[in-house]
């Protein structure tokens, strides 16, 4: 594919382009660290193998000096869009969202992903916005919590659920832990 069409979507980290039959190219902005992209690819392959309803990861590519990932193209509206156009189905959609969330948490996080404790405590020690006593209290509370091994999406909301003919599909795993 030499020339890319107009993007299907533009997010905070990337643009999504049609990329041949049944595929899309998630082309990351140059400011996105390669380590984040590698993590998304590794996590995507892991959760795909775990049987979660996610887009298939095909390959990584470089286009015009930018890193990209070729994914299965997922067709359909987001669950957020469905909520906006069919609000009378809110209870059904809430149950769907809860069921998907439970499915995600039934999977152990892949090796090498940041743990939930590491993620939760990440920026607290350096936060200038928190008073020191509150910062210390939060860190003590987090340290007292049991370690967890469950996969966490990190950005799980109705906008990251695509409703397809084959069922709901969970997208955007960059912030998983």
Predicted regions and their residues:
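Short beta-strand micro-motifs within the conserved protein kinase catalytic domain, predominantly
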Residues: 56-67
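An alpha-helical support segment within catalytic cores of ATP-dependent transferases
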Residues: 106-154, 164-165
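Conserved short submotifs of the Hanks-type protein kinase catalytic core
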Residues: 65-78
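Conserved kinase catalytic-core helix
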Residues: 80-114
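Active-site Asp-x-Gly
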Residues: 150, 164-177
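ATP-binding glycine-rich loop module of kinase domains
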Residues: 10-37
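The N-lobe alphaC helix and its flanking beta3-alphaC-beta4 segment of protein kinase-like domains
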Residues: 35-50
């Amino acid at each position: 594919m030499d020339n890319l069409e107009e993007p299907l979507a533009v997010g905070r980290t990337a643009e999504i382009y049609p990329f041949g039959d049944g595929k899309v190219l998630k082309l990351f902005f140059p400011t996105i660290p390669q380590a984040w992209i590698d993590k998304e690819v590794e996590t995507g392959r892991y959760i795909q193998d775990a049987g979660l309803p996610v887009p298939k990861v095909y390959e990584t590519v470089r286009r015009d000096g930018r890193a990209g990932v070729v994914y299965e193209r997922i067709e359909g509206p987001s669950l957020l869009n469905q909520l906006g156009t069919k609000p009378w189905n809110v209870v059904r959609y809430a149950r769907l969202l809860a069921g998907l969330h439970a499915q995600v948490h039934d999977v152990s996080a892949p090796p090498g992903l940041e743990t939930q404790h590491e993620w939760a405590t990440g920026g607290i020690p350096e936060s200038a916005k928190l008073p020191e006593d509150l910062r210390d209290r939060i860190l003590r509370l987090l340290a007292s919590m049991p370690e967890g091994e469950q996969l966490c999406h990190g950005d799980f909301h109705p906008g990251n659920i695509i409703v397809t003919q084959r069922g709901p599909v969970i997208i955007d795993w960059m912030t998983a832990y």
